[in-house]
Regions:
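A cross-kingdom feature strongest in bacterial/archaeal respiratory oxidoreductases
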Residues: 3-10, 14-136, 171-327
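Short, charged beta->alpha transition segments
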Residues: 45-49, 142, 161-162
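Alpha-amylase-like alpha-glycosidases and glucanotransferases acting on alpha-linked glucans and related
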Residues: 131-147
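Non-catalytic, well-ordered alpha-helical segments in soluble enzyme domains
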Residues: 143-159
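Charge-patterned, long linear interaction tracts outside catalytic cores
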Residues: 155-159, 165-178
Length: 327
């Protein structure tokens, strides 16, 4: 099946990944890990669940994510979670997605899994740590979950030769030729590996990681994908120029995602220390706009658009542009 969203969001899906990865192989000698630039577009997946276009998606696995709070248009996302035929959640918490899931699997905690940091293969450094304890009860690490699922679905066991993360990580670091026997030995005696610094690597490796081999201010790959090669400003889809009637009903521009940083999506709200620092939800508004609307710092306000509304307290700050709020 064709990757959902790859026809519109080309850079972060198969078309962009293929072009970028080919250049990575030319300069690095290996392809770019699929973690980068190789994703189905999330909102398009939810739309496909609801509409059946371009094809019907019948199953969804939510691994360490709470889609209701992680994507825009929460109502559409929630409707998709309710409609999909088979929903599985792997997480620490009983998230809204978990409440609608057919199966919920508890994930192993940070102390129950070994750690490797390679930035998904995008850098040439390796850092690691040992697990403190084996997973308790019926908790599983990500690798354990996907390995068992793959084997249960009939995948070739030869594709899953490792039974533990330590075996996988030992395999990953083996080509480095480091003076260690396995992953635990690496963690105990090396822990962090950075290769020797080489200046002017672009000379010996055939240039930079671009089709031209040069630093590109005008991206060849973006142009090949049908986008402008240079950064171009485009207003939001629902702007006052293209939608003057909508602007009359909703005259303030809403931006999101710039909230209190220890909170990310739905993370850390259960932590007493975080709630002590930030017990209530706040939105940011310029003092000039607040004065026009007779809003004072700390006032509870309704924030509303055509998709829904929420109630938050006002945080007056000159950092916000007049006419724009962040919630």
């Amino acid at each position: 099946a064709k990757q959902i969203g790859s026809d519109k969001f080309k850079l972060t899906s198969w078309p962009g990944y293929t072009l970028i990865s080919n250049n990575a192989k030319r300069t690095w000698g290996k392809t770019l890990p699929a973690e980068w630039f190789c994703e189905a577009h999330g909102p398009s997946v939810f739309k496909a669940i609801l509409t059946g276009e371009p094809y019907q998606i019948r199953a969804l696995i939510c691994n360490a994510t709470n889609p209701v709070n992680s994507y825009g248009d929460s109502k559409m996302t929630l409707a998709a979670l309710k409609k999909v035929e088979f929903l599985v959640t792997v997480d620490y918490w009983m998230t809204p997605a978990a409440l609608f899931s057919d199966y919920v699997f508890p994930a192993a905690g940070a102390l129950e899994r070994p750690t490797i940091v390679t930035h998904y293969g995008a850098t040439d450094s390796v850092m690691g740590g040992r697990r403190a304890i084996q997973p308790k009860f019926d908790r599983h690490t990500d690798m354990s979950f996907w390995r068992m699922l793959g084997l249960a679905c009939g995948q070739d066991p030869a594709n899953w030769p490792w039974e533990t993360e330590e075996e996988v990580y030992s395999y990953i670091i083996a080509p480095l030729g480091l003076p260690c026997t396995d992953w635990n030995d690496f963690v105990n005696n090396i822990r962090m590996y950075y290769p020797p610094l080489h200046q002017n690597k672009y000379v010996t490796r055939g240039g930079f990681w671009t089709p031209t081999g040069k630093i590109e201010c005008n991206s060849t790959i973006l142009r090949e994908l049908g986008y402008p090669g240079m950064p171009t400003y485009l207003p939001c889809a629902e702007n006052d120029i293209d939608n003057p009637e909508l602007a009359e009903e909703y005259p303030i521009v809403l931006t999101t995602g710039g909230g209190f940083m220890p909170y990310h999506h739905s993370e850390h709200f259960q932590m007493q220390g975080m709630r002590y620092l930030y017990p209530d939800p706040y939105y940011s508004i310029n003092p000039e706009l607040a004065e026009k609307l007779d809003i004072e710092h700390g006032d509870w306000c309704w924030i509303e658009n055509g998709r829904g509304r929420c109630r938050q307290r006002a945080l007056l700050t000159p950092q916000m542009k007049p006419g724009v709020i962040n919630a």
